[in-house]
Design a protein with these regions (language model features):
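Hydrophobic/aromatic-rich transmembrane helices and adjacent perimembrane loops
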Residues: 64-71, 236-239, 279-280, 388-421
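Short periplasmic/luminal acceptor-recognition loop of GT-C membrane glycosyltransferases, typified by
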Residues: 153-154, 455-534
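Short hydrophobic alpha-helices at membrane interfaces in multi-pass membrane enzymes
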Residues: 208-212, 237-268, 297-306, 369-378, ...
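Transmembrane catalytic cores of multi-pass membrane glycosyltransferases
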Residues: 42-47, 114-160, 172-184, 219-229, ...
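Signature aromatic-anchored transmembrane alpha helix within multi-pass, membrane-resident enzymes
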Residues: 23, 28, 257-261, 286, ...
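Membrane-interface micro-motifs in multi-pass membrane enzymes
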Residues: 51, 55-74, 156, 181-182, ...
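Start-transfer (signal-anchor) and selected internal transmembrane alpha helices
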Residues: 1-2, 6-39, 62-118
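Transmembrane-helix motifs of polytopic, lipid-linked glycan transferases
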Residues: 180-203, 236
Length: 534
């Protein structure tokens, strides 16, 4: 009698006893070549399709990220269907397993210490890492300029108005108010990450290990000192998705309206924080309402229609105030990097395939009440964000839901779990963070040098003497940073709509940048050393 591993794949599923290992043994002879063909297509074929002109690296190298993402989704879906999702599922019922309570205060303490250390090293210069862009934008807002209209800003308005509110509330300068807001964002985001993993119902004992792996990978972004790289921006939407598990279960109309209202509020909060996560949340909640609830089809269609109306209103307001402009430009490839076969990208591909297998088997087994499915739906739109500007940091942060869900699933398999966890630790945590430290070491050294040699930093008197050498006003299209860190703010200097050449990526923004320099001949230009490099 033949072993099930020797049976044709379709026969194995008819027996109902095929395990993922059985399917792997029977399919690896064709699946490995299939994966290699898929990789070749994803990494090469997009070079044959032209993309819209921009200053993005992808355009310079002739790589079309949109085609690459479409090919990834196609080969993932086809591979899942051909393997029947490797029968990746569990018959164990969902259950609540709490994280150890001591992990939260320890996590908060480490975040506080990390933020305090970075502030002690570089906070006084009000412009280290990612923070100079944000502090400069907050300063323009404080001058009465309107964000998104008078000056460009690529994140949600909460990252501008939060620090400014602290500036008006407390006796702190704009720079210090920003760093306080950054620290509070990291702390609050850590709480959301902890609660998200703690509250999700899943039959695994590995939740503490998964929390540690996600937490430490995100902790090292403190070296960037940017509110755009904190747990609040990326863990908050996951927590709200987990909260969706209690929604759309009651068919009574007042309860449906309440659930719609709650989702609209959640979506609006995410627009204020990070608009692309609001889009992903809207997609996730719609899929949950349509596919994961046992209500009558008429009621599910009603919920979906009301969600479209509610989200449409939220996004219409955001569009009116130009909050979505940067997201739409980025979606067109304005800041893309080519998708290359680096270790973080490959591990991310594997995590996407694992999640797709689980989603497929969930529908096959009709186990659509799985609390993790909301994370999977959320992760689908976030693929575009992760594989647009696809450096390791963007892959990790935008792929946070994918990594979280895939770690949960792999923790159920004794042999696969340590292999997958090791791959994650090496190529999503250690390798990217080591390179991150390498990139920021020169800035850290510069900050330490100015600490030891304060006379090397231009004094206020010298800067004012420089500015008074010209009787008129100035234009500083590339910023004015006498100490090499934060921009020196002066009402006599016009900095333009864009910060330096950040996000000056599409023909329209390039033309606007050139007009700022050429249409005011009465103003003197402040240029950095070697301006021809720009």
């Amino acid at each position: 009698m033949k072993d099930t591993a020797d049976l044709p794949l379709a026969n194995q599923f008819r027996t109902g006893i095929a395990s993922p290992a059985d399917i792997w043994r029977s399919s690896k002879r064709w699946f490995i070549p299939y994966v290699l063909i898929a990789f070749a297509a994803i990494f090469y074929l997009p070079r044959l399709v032209p993309s819209a002109p921009s200053a993005a690296d992808s355009y310079l190298f002739g790589y079309n990220n949109r085609i690459g993402i479409i090919l990834l989704l196609f080969f993932t879906a086809l591979g899942v269907v051909l393997t029947r999702g490797f029968n990746l599922h569990t018959d164990a019922p969902s259950e609540y397993r709490a994280l150890p309570r001591w992990m939260l205060p320890v996590s908060l303490l480490l975040v506080a210490l990390g933020c305090a250390a970075m502030y002690a090293i570089a906070g006084r210069y009000h412009g280290f890492g990612e923070s100079y862009y944000l502090i400069d934008r907050i300063s323009l807002l404080n001058q009465g300029r309107v964000p998104y209209r008078d000056f460009e800003f690529v994140y949600g308005p909460a990252q501008l108005y939060g620090p400014l509110w602290l500036h008006h509330l407390l006796p702190l300068g704009i720079g210090d108010s920003y760093y306080l807001f950054w620290t509070l964002s990291y702390l609050l985001g850590t709480w959301f990450l902890f609660k998200c993993i703690d509250e999700i119902r899943f039959p695994t004992s590995a939740k503490p290990a998964i929390y540690v792996m996600l937490y430490v990978a995100g902790l090292f972004a403190t070296i960037r000192m940017g509110t755009n790289y904190t747990f609040l921006r990326y863990a908050l939407p996951l927590y709200l998705v987990v909260k969706l598990n209690t929604r759309f279960r009651d068919a009574r109309f007042p309860r449906i309206i309440l659930d719609i209202f709650v989702c609209a509020v959640f979506c609006a909060i995410l627009v204020l924080s990070s608009p692309e996560t609001a889009v992903a949340f809207g997609f996730s909640s719609g899929c949950i309402a349509l596919f994961c609830r046992s209500l009558a089809i008429r009621q599910r269609m009603l919920i979906a229609t009301l969600l479209v109306i509610a989200y449409g209103a939220v996004f219409a307001v955001a569009l009116k105030f130009h909050v979505l402009d940067a997201m739409l430009a980025d979606g067109g490839g304005a800041i893309n990097f080519p998708i290359v076969p680096g270790p973080p990208i490959l591990v991310y591909f594997v995590s996407i395939f694992i999640c797709a297998c689980w989603l497929f088997r969930g529908f096959i087994h009709r186990s659509t009440d799985d609390p993790t499915l909301g994370l999977l739906f959320f992760s689908i739109p976030m693929i575009a964000a992760a594989l647009g500007r696809c450096d390791p940091s963007h892959v990790f942060w935008n792929g946070l839901a994918t990594f979280f869900a895939s770690l949960l699933y792999m923790s159920l398999f004794r042999r696969a779990w340590p292999i997958y966890a090791l791959a994650y630790l090496l190529f999503i945590f250690l390798l990217p963070n080591a390179s991150e430290f390498y990139l920021f070491v020169p800035q850290v050294r510069a900050a330490r040098y100015l600490d030891k040699h304060p006379q090397a930093r231009p004094s206020e008197t010298k800067i004012q003497a420089f500015l008074t050498s010209w009787p008129g006003n100035y234009v500083a299209p590339f910023g004015f940073r006498p100490d090499g860190f934060g921009t020196y703010q002066s009402p006599r200097i016009e900095y333009g709509r864009f910060e330096d050449v950040i996000n000056v990526s599409i023909p329209h923004s390039v033309d606007q940048k050139l007009r700022e320099m050429s249409t005011r001949p009465d103003r003197a230009l402040i240029l950095p050393a070697n301006p021809e490099e720009y």
